[in-house]
Amino acid sequence: MQRDYLIRVETESMSDFKRLNGLMIGFVIKGEAHIYDENNMTQCNSGDIFIINHRDLYRFQLQQDGIICYIQFQMKYLADKFDDAHCLYFHLTDATTTKNKHQLRNIMARLVSTHIRHNELSKLTEQQLVIQLLMHMIHYVPRTYHSNQSILNDDKVNQVCDYIELHFHEDLSLSELSEYVGWSESHLSKKFAESLGVGFQHFLNTTRIEHAKLDLTYTDEMITDIALQNGFSSAASFARTFKHITHQTPKQYRGDRPAVTENQQSAQHDYHDRELILLLNDYIEEMNHFIEDIEMMNYKEITFQPTNQQLNQFNHIIQVGYLRNLLNTQYQSQLLTCHHDFQVNEVLAYDVMPYIMKKLNAPFTYDAEISNIFYDIDLCLDFLLDHNFSLTMHLDQYDSRDYIDAFKVFIHHVALHVSHRKDLKFNLYVTTLHTSLIEMIDYFKALFPNGGLYIHLDQATERQLPLLKRLEPHIDHFVFDANSNNAVDFNKMNDDEFKTASQMIINKTNYLIDLMHRHHLKRPLILLNWNTLTGDTFITNGECFRGGIIIEQLLKLSSKVEGIGYWLNYDLHVSHCRNERDYMNSIELFHQYNGKRPVYFTALLFNKLTSNILYSDDTCIVTGTDSNFQILLYDAKHFNPYLALDNQMNMRATEMIHLNINALEEGMYKIKHFTLDKENGALFNLWRKHHTIHGMDKDSIDYVNRMSFPKLEVYDIDMTDTLALNIKMITNGIHLIEVKRYPSS
């Protein structure tokens, strides 16, 4: 058996130099180590990485309590993976950034830790991490191709050595190798002795013995089998050659290493496996969010307990910009879809008074008998009435007499238009306070007694507290904005600011609740414009999946906020923004061509939760009853969105969650499992793949919209007591599992 690579932990120094066949990369786990080559000594401290290349002479000198680990790749294995592997030369330089060194160290620490643990997934995980390590070295560690990086001065001798390293287990002869390089046997023998100081046969036997040592150390195979698979004609020939080179018989060599097996580390010294794993964990944590690791396990046990906690669903307020946008059939369809999927029932529109003032002050005489300046407005009102939507209108710059007069004309007309139908739920929203609002609200309430007044609450509003108190009897809600991006100076890229920004929404919510309490203001809150960290550019769209972050914010806000606002779609949103920074203030539900953004599905999944909370922790909530419940699991990792632009560093962090729901009633249950993550339901990844310089045709649009949807799995399961689920969680993903017991027959 020939091993492709070795994974070792060493606590003892080497007494002599060795020449490496293959490639070695490692780091100092603890203490200090001196790494010697032919000409230099490199002092390595804890965490420092070292690389030893093919044919290099090397020796380790460990200081007191020093521990190193390394991965040694056999040349035959490398040759199968890379062209000209024997010429590949890696060297750590200043070009190897700290971030990339952390990544290398992290992969190695995971690899060694996995090897020590030796569970049923270890071999598969080792192979994955080994490939990941090599890929990372190829991408991030500077390399050159040196045809003569070894001590050999003759390229043809070098070729022979490489050939022997790759084919040592075959029947090789001086005649065959001389023909391989185009020399006579005598000339090759002479050059070999001049370059290496040993003859051809001695070099061949030494190479075979070094590989046989690995089999003696790491396998339980019979000595005869080891002899034959390493190129010897018989066990007797192998034994003679082995004793000549090592001064031991193969049996004696194996007997001196009774504690070492293929699945254990050779040099444990005074350190047990658990101690080594704890030491390695310090390095694994450094880049934990950016490394894919199928052995990242999380075991969660849930037993339902009686609780008085309740989960509150939100009233969703959808911004459409100008009221006339409600005449667009595509926008109407989007609103109705939202209404169906998560009970959207309120629309926020911009102020129509400037339009009415312009019509009333037109240079020609308005004739009510032949024209209607409210025609389009009436059509919009009819749509809202037909589908039970309420209308909230933003009043802006309302302090002039002309504005107040136009407002009264508008309100009077709306009251007349809806009087013959069911009542329209009508609200007014103001972002600034002025005394003229008192006159306007009195007129409004006379015609719409059930109408509401929304006041934007911030520090400017607080400075007008006396007027706010006068209006308080008419106020239904206080409205506020909270954009995490406002807490960050993107030009500085300060990670501390990004950490603070991750809590910005909930912190501002708590600040306003405290402000209301101090001034004895008791009204529910609406979070209208809000966003998590995105970066101040459209480039990050789709690169940083945020579903889990958004669901985390919704759960934190559910007991503090009554309403949540969204823009209906990208086109409406961006058309009302002055710049990219302004665009970051809010989130839209639809992209172009009716494509649903992940935030849409986040709202949809959140709406599937019921009010009774059975269990909750930092990453999970269960609602419902013990026979009909919903499990929401999510991952929320807040990090600088610009890191998502580095494709190599933005690897998926995959966690396998083993979830047990205990003490359930025996019976047959139906399971519906929704998965929303970067691979399931993320619009922009598919969008970019199917978008051309000329846009998207209908087939592409239909396909992208059809495929951009959370994954759904449905199945039945017969349970006696415990529901066991295995859930693959990708960074910032969301899983909603609906569990319903069938009635007993």
UniProtKB/Swiss-Prot annotation:
Q: Which residues bind DNA?
A: 175-196, 223-246
Source organism phylogeny: Bacteria, Bacillati, Bacillota, Bacilli, Bacillales
Does the record bear Repeat in its keywords?
Answer: yes
Q: Which organism is it from?
A: Staphylococcus aureus
Gene3D superfamilies, per the entry: Glycosidases, Glycosyl hydrolase domain, family 39, Homeodomain-like
Tell me the InterPro entries matching this sequence: Glycoside_hydrolase_SF (IPR017853), Homeodomain-like_sf (IPR009057), HTH-like (IPR037923), HTH_AraC (IPR018060), Tscrpt_reg_AraC-type_HTH (IPR020449)
Name used for this protein in its record? Uncharacterized HTH-type transcriptional regulator
Which molecular-function annotations from GO does this UniProt entry contain? DNA-binding transcription factor activity; sequence-specific DNA binding
Where in this chain does the record put each HTH araC/xylS-type domain? 158-256
Q: Provide this UniProt record's keywords sorted from A to Z.
A: DNA-binding, Repeat, Transcription, Transcription regulation
Question: One Pfam family, short name please?
Answer: HTH_18
